[in-house]
A protein has these predicted regions:
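Repeated scaffold domains used in trafficking and secretory/extracellular systems
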Residues: 2-15, 57-68, 105-112, 150-157, ...
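Conserved Ser/Thr-centered positions that define the repeating blades of beta-propeller domains
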Residues: 17, 36-37, 69, 89-90, ...
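Surface loop/turn motifs at the tips and blade-to-blade linkers of beta-strand repeat domains
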Residues: 1, 48-50, 57, 100-103, ...
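Asp-box/BNR beta-propeller loop motif
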Residues: 1, 34-45, 88-98, 133-144, ...
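Residue-level marker for isolated small/hydroxyl-bearing positions within beta-strands
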Residues: 25-27, 78, 121-122, 167, ...
Length: 211
């Protein structure tokens, strides 16, 4: 698929659901989304008109990012387009609800834990800085975590949500780690900077950064 830009795959067994059973793929050239519920063997194609009140940029923007719970039920999509915000679904995108936290101009990246209740996003604020914001109730309420001394860009969350890693881009080099569900943070690697993507193992023991 030449236009494929982002894919999300379920990575955990839960309630008799197979590892990798649910797969979601977005295209950057067409306003389409492809969904598989059988490990990619068959696919169902959706378009913006299938989801009322959903901005088509969620389907056709190269900055679209996806986070999915371990059972495939909870799905969060972010779009970097200004004032577009987030998309939330509790039924594997059969239906979806757009929403946006306060003082969040655009969403740069997103991650969630295995249950899908703990959601982390990086938002560009009105001062053109990037804030890390956390929700512990499936995206209903949000708490700003970072301050003016650090601007988050990319992030990753462990399966249980206990461990998180964030990286701050060119001006705020270094990876910061939390081992208490985002309550406190420590600088663990001062060299890493401007990572395109971060990865964290399910137990939080291993992390990888692509620069």
């Amino acid at each position: 698929n030449k236009g494929l830009r982002f894919m999300s795959v379920l990575k955990r067994r839960s309630n008799n659901i197979k590892d990798g059973q649910y797969v979601i793929a977005f295209s950057d050239s067409r306003a389409l989304i492809d969904i598989s519920k059988d490990c990619g063997m068959t696919w169902t194609r959706r378009q913006p008109s299938d989801l009322p009140n959903v901005n088509e940029y969620f389907f056709s923007n190269d900055r679209t990012r996806i986070a999915m719970s371990g059972d495939g039920r909870h799905i969060y999509c972010s779009c970097y387009m200004a004032n577009v915000g987030l998309l939330r679904s509790t039924d594997f995108l059969e239906t979806a609800e757009p929403f946006k936290p306060d003082n969040c101009y655009s969403v740069y990246s997103i991650a969630c834990n295995g249950r899908g209740n703990l959601v982390a996003i990086v938002c560009q604020n009105s001062n053109n800085k990037y804030d890390l914001m956390l929700s512990g109730d499936y995206g209903k309420t949000w708490t700003k975590i970072t301050d003016s001394s650090f601007s988050a860009r990319t992030l990753a969350v462990s399966y249980d949500g206990k461990y998180m890693v964030i990286e701050g881009g060119y001006s705020y080099s270094g990876a910061r780690i939390s081992a208490d569900y985002g309550k406190t943070w420590a600088l663990k690697h001062s060299v890493i900077g401007n990572s395109f993507a971060l990865g964290l193992s399910s137990d939080g023991k291993y992390a990888i950064a692509q620069e």
